[in-house]
UniProtKB/Swiss-Prot annotation:
GO biological process per UniProt: acetate metabolic process; acetyl-CoA biosynthetic process
EC class: transferase
Gene Ontology molecular function: any one: ATP binding
Lineage: Bacteria, Pseudomonadati, Pseudomonadota, Gammaproteobacteria, Cardiobacteriales
Assembly with partners or alone: Homodimer.
Active site: 143 (proton donor/acceptor)
UniProt-recorded name of the protein: Acetate kinase
CDD domains (alphabetical): ASKHA_NBD_AcK_PK (cd24010)
Amino acid sequence: MQFVLVLNCGSSSLKFAVMNPTSGDVLLNGTAERLGHDVGSLTVKDESGKAVQEIKPGTHAQALELIVETLKTKNLMDKIAAVGHRLVHGGEFFKESVVINNEVREKVAECIRLAPLHNPANITGIEAALKVFPKLPQVGVFDTAFHQQMPEKAYLYPLPRKFYEEFHIRRYGFHGTSFRYIASQLESVTGLKNPRTVVCHLGNGGSLAAIKDGHSVDTTMGLTPLEGIVHGTRCGDIDPAIIQILQKQFHISATEMNEILWKKSGLLGLSGISNDCRSLEEAMAEGNEAAIRALEVYCYRLAKHIAAQMVALNGCDALVFTGGIGENSAFVRANTMEQLAFLGFELDKKANEETSRGKQGKISTANSKPVWVIPTNEELLIARDTAQLSGMTR
């Protein structure tokens, strides 16, 4: 039996999973954190539980070396047939997953200007994997690829045309691998053939996609993952003039402003408590006004974006919640859908409250437009793309 090693390389983290691309079974997975610091950590999980190891000085390359040592200990090293990489931004170069070669690496590097926080880390992961697995095929699966079929009216910004023509400034969208996985499950789960579906991928970062005939026709994130709904620490949609006003009023540098927009806003900024929805729901239950306010803004803006995605579909046959918040927060689902009752949505309270922690199910009433919770599995889709493109499966 041959397996795929799936890598998801962030600026200070590296997530991995060893998967059977056919069955979807995960033999081993884990996360290296605090990379780039003096001391990082690697948490590895298998059937027997989890183990935590220190990494010094905590680089991506050393994290991968430690992962390889773990694979050897588990007698899995010789069973890895290919490596699949989650890559954030492929620009207009990539409309589907690809085998990574020198040309692909160069184009991913070209997209750094579009994703300066994400693509450098992705490249670091590729380089580290090529050193450790020089003879194995490496496959790149892009977050942006699924949205490359959006119509021009959905991806253009109302800016001077030259910015698009010369610099490719446009809306790209993200979470594409998650949306593509959900799209692949829609007919078998809902019983509907090619339903017009709004999918809500809600986590620390969140976005929506309007899916028609299996393709994305609109989404809420834009040039970067900053646009769209309220996120955990990112602001989502704001008036762009706010940036210049704040910089002038408070003498904030561009770097500091970036830090505010990306890491100090969203649920964290609104509440002053946490970016974690679970923590805010606990605080809300205790009557904390800041937590109540933050969640009200989150759900209200989410409801508005759901309605907007329905415009792109000229209606809606089904709505799906996925991602950490989407799969587990009965409160967010209920509060959001109450605001969309006028569009024909009504949740079954019992079904909504019982559907979490990996459960899949319909959470709407019989008279409602169907609302589903479908757990996403980005790693499985990356593993299957990798297996197919590397020749493991046909």
